[in-house]
A protein has these predicted regions:
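Hydrophobic alpha-helical connector segments
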Residues: 60, 74-105, 157-164
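Helix-turn-helix
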Residues: 2-3, 14, 22-56, 60
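Amphipathic alpha-helical packing segments from all-alpha helical-bundle domains
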Residues: 70, 85-88, 121-147, 159-162, ...
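Hydrophobic alpha-helical segments that form the core
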Residues: 105, 110, 114, 155-174, ...
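Amphipathic C-terminal alpha-helical segment
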Residues: 97-100, 144, 164-182, 194-201
Length: 201
């Protein structure tokens, strides 16, 4: 049973993590306040007092997801010595996240858009922007390699980055549908090959 008041040792990060799991599993609309109370183990007045509204709580879980779960994808992309290796590392990190046994599966952002997305225009725009932010990040990595002479000047940066972003979303949905990690990793191995025609010798 949920506690009747906000516990003295209320941990906002822990509460956000539990709310994230509920939204990740069910989607925004299908996650009821009862679901959140059970997941977060605090009562609804305390949830409203701490976060303002269900929409505001969802918005905060988006930020939390980016920092606590999805940050590794960007770090993997940028820490590699070249874009091809970075994209492969990003895909590997994504698959680890999408198939982790302690999460509902897939990508929280993609799941939120695909099923029971929030109806408010502002949150819809935030989710859409986040989905395509990966394309922008990959494009920056490709441009870095072009400037460094690792990729040809005629590299179709936008086309490649959009394609990779779409592939990531597809991997997320496949993981959500239960496609195993081994099969997903085999797909990941081919990710670097898309860049090969534009690599400098």
């Amino acid at each position: 049973m949920a506690q009747r008041g906000r516990p003295r040792n209320f941990n906002r990060t822990h509460a956000l993590d539990r709310a994230l799991m509920a939204f990740w599993q069910n989607g925004f609309e299908a996650t009821s306040m009862h679901n959140l109370v059970e997941a977060m183990q605090i009562n609804s007045p305390s949830i409203y007092a701490a976060f303002g509204s269900k929409e505001a709580l969802f918005a905060e879980t988006i930020d939390y997801y980016r920092e606590a779960y999805a940050r590794q994808l960007l770090q993997s992309l940028n820490d590699a010595p070249d874009a091809a290796s970075g994209i492969e590392a990003m895909f590997e990190a994504a698959i680890e996240l999408f198939t982790h046994q302690d999460t509902p599966g897939g990508c929280f952002v993609v799941n939120s858009v695909a099923s029971n997305a929030p109806r408010g225009l502002e949150l819809e725009q935030v989710l859409t922007r986040l989905r395509w932010q990966r394309s922008e990040q990959i494009a920056e990595r490709l441009k870095t390699d072009v400037r460094a002479g690792k990729l040809r000047d005629d590299t179709p940066v936008q086309d490649l980055s959009d394609l990779y972003a779409v592939l990531l979303q597809g991997l997320a949905q496949a993981a959500r549908d239960g496609l195993g990690k081994t099969r997903l990793m085999r797909l990941c191995e081919h990710s670097r090959h898309l860049i090969l025609p534009w690599r400098m010798n």
